[in-house]
Amino acid sequence: MTADNAIFIPPYKADDQDVVVELHNRFGAEAFVAQETRTGMPVLWVKRAQLKEVLSFLRGVSKPYSMLYDLHGVDERLRTQRRGLPAADFSVFYHLLSVERNSDVMIKVSLSEGDLNLPTVTGIWPNANWYEREVWDMFGIDFAGHPHLSRIMMPPTWEGHPLRKDYPARATEFDPYSLTLAKQQLEEESARFNPEAWGMKRQGANEDYMFLNLGPNHPSAHGAFRIVLQLDGEEIVDCVPDIGYHHRGAEKMAERQSWHSFIPYTDRIDYLGGVMNNLPYVLAVEKLAGIQVPQKVDVIRIMLAEFFRITSHLLFLGTYIQDVGAMTPVFFTFTDRQRAYTVIEAITGFRLHPAWYRIGGVAHDLPRGWEKLVKDFVEWLPKRLDEYTKAALQNSILKGRTIGVAAYNTKEALEWGTTGAGLRATGCDFDLRKARPYSGYENFEFEVPLAHNGDAYDRCMVRVEEMRQSIRIIDQCLRNMPEGPYKADHPLTTPPPKERTLQHIETLITHFLQVSWGPVMPANESFQMIEATKGINSYYLTSDGGTMSYRTRIRTPSYPHLQQIPSVIKGSMVADLIAYLGSIDFVMADVDR
């Protein structure tokens, strides 16, 4: 993308109603039911008969909603706080994002239990494919016309739909598990790849195709990830990514944890992102509760989040270069990560999974001596990045393996839901820290690194430059750390300030209930997205006025990034796929949740 055709991104305006006016003008106001939420976007319910027409209109409107950011479902049957909403046993939501407008809109449709089907929208947004499969997998909602509606998170032999409210949430609610020989053989046979089921031929006009399983146990697959390759020699004719091996039911877990006790579970999504995982969750809960955190909390959160951006990118850099054949850099990047973890551990008490952010603040104040630790790191890392750039990134073999490999443009990136460095490597200047500042990022000076070829090499270079910008942000946190409390003065802050419990019996009772049962959040919906280490990560929370989330939707960046693989890599060599997989920068917990 050149400067001549770069997308202009206007200033962000929450709850932008311009699209609502356009929809009313096109379909009539009576076609929609507006829902008041704290999501920061218009939320409109439509009838199933008009769903596809409405979505097609939004896809083709001036400054279109080019990205289907998310698509998922909700079991509405046990929800009590639904005043003013259409009757529904289940609902499906379509979260659309327009970079050109810098705004979002959410379209919802209600379904009755005896008629759980919708038309597919894979012809409008290609990345709807996996999302619709997951909705069928988790809720049993059918999508007519879908090219391959099958399990995606659960094994093919699984029975039931886990995110339904009548599906057990605990293993103890099932019969004891036993693996008989017959069951083992059934599971093994179900994992066998059938090319015809995916529309693939075993033979061409003059050749036989070979089908190769890469993974789910392969070092270049970066986790429990299987991709089946249809090969003509070493050329990739087609491929089928197969995910779900790392699925742990994170969204189901959120329905049986209190708002506070779910925080450690967020750390396990992108397990390299540390407190970066906590941030969208606690910000979304704070929106529900109406909590405004002190400025010091914002700055502390940003500083720690940028530390984890650096540690994640260092791991990416080492393993990426290793994937294309150089062994030495990975040892250096792992050693350098330890310098960052020394600072992180001194501040939070933990390394990879601190679970350190809290509803309304952070776990505790900064320790004595934190300034020197941060200052030493800020002064040291830029020199190391210079060494990596000179010794590794300018290496002719690395360039030969990655320049021009697995390239795509901005239009393709948006259609597949690609965000983060993968999007900015195409020249699209969309970084939420700038485009939609949260947690005080608007108070910091930094640049958004861009590239223009959208290939494997550019994705690497963007992340290296992002580390330099993270150092700038951390340095500003160091120099401008505000005084004040590390926790908000709000009744729903969790855990509440200890000093309030030492007054009389009523404060002790309140403290006990809030810590043991958890805070009661107002009935509403909230949403928060952030620029995480691997792209845009978000939490969409539904509260029914209780101590636990009614529905927690976790949208992760790695999920659509893997879905994009076949469209990018067809016609390339197997060696190019290895370079491409490394350049994506994903972890399977971020994909499978």
Swiss-Prot record:
Cellular component (GO) terms are:
NADH dehydrogenase complex; plasma membrane
* NADH dehydrogenase I subunit C as annotated region, ranges: 1-184
Q: Which UniProt keywords apply?
A: Cell inner membrane, Cell membrane, Membrane, Multifunctional enzyme, NAD, Quinone, Translocase, Transport, Ubiquinone
Give the highest taxon in the source lineage: Bacteria
Q: What is its EC number?
A: 7.1.1.-
Q: Which gene encodes it?
A: nuoC
For this protein, the record's InterPro entries field holds: NADH_DH_suC, NADH_DH_suCD, NADH_Q_OxRdtase_suD, NADH_quin_OxRdtase_su_C/D-like, NADH_UbQ_OxRdtase_30kDa_su, NADH_UbQ_OxRdtase_49kDa_CS, NDH1_su_D/H, NiFe-Hase_large
Cite a single Pfam family from the UniProt record.
Complex1_30kDa
Q: What does this protein do?
A: NDH-1 shuttles electrons from NADH, via FMN and iron-sulfur (Fe-S) centers, to quinones in the respiratory chain. The immediate electron acceptor for the enzyme in this species is believed to be ubiquinone. Couples the redox reaction to proton translocation (for every two electrons transferred, four hydrogen ions are translocated across the cytoplasmic membrane), and thus conserves the redox energy in a proton gradient.
Q: Which protein, by its recorded name, is this? A: NADH-quinone oxidoreductase subunit C/D
Spell out the molecular function terms from Gene Ontology: NAD binding; NADH dehydrogenase (ubiquinone) activity; NADH:ubiquinone reductase (non-electrogenic) activity; quinone binding
Q: How does it assemble?
A: NDH-1 is composed of 13 different subunits. Subunits NuoB, CD, E, F, and G constitute the peripheral sector of the complex.
What membrane topology is annotated for this entry?
Peripheral membrane protein
Q: Provide the residue span(s) of the region labelled NADH dehydrogenase I subunit D.
A: 208-593
Q: Which family does it belong to?
A: In the N-terminal section; belongs to the complex I 30 kDa subunit family.
The scientific name of the source species is Pseudomonas putida (strain W619)
* Catalytic activity from the UniProt record: a quinone + NADH + 5 H(+)(in) = a quinol + NAD(+) + 4 H(+)(out)
Q: Where in the cell is it found?
A: Cell inner membrane
Q: What is the lineage of its organism?
A: Bacteria, Pseudomonadati, Pseudomonadota, Gammaproteobacteria, Pseudomonadales
